[in-house]
Amino acid sequence: MNQKRGVSDVLAFFYALWSFSALGRSSYEYLFKNPRPANLVPAHLSTFVGVLYIFIIVGLRRRSPRAWWITLGLLLVELSGVLLVGTIDVIWRPFPYATVWSNYGIGYFFMPLILPFLGLAWIVRRETRAAYGVLRRE
């Protein structure tokens, strides 16, 4: 197994696992939680997270400069989101029930907080940028 491919495969596996989890959570929330508009915000947020994770998986699997830039942006959106929602939830608790990013992903063993850091650390490496064609091989 190619080491460069191996790391992206492991990241893609975990993102797939968490996307199923986030979309499953949002489906449950849409079906069984009180459908008042204020109660739909956590469901919408969980759906957004699940779809975001799917796009990150696609970016991790493709190898092009465009895919690298898009994946970098998506990872930054994910990190910003989990930090923002996690902080708001700790300080204020605005949602009637938890989201994927509540308390920095405590319900998911903090993986929503850890994964973007791992993804960013991997994607900015020189070898990874070269594999995506962002950095010219010397």
Q: What residue ranges belong to the model's regions?
A:
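Topology signature of small-to-medium multi-pass alpha-helical membrane proteins
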Residues: M1-E138
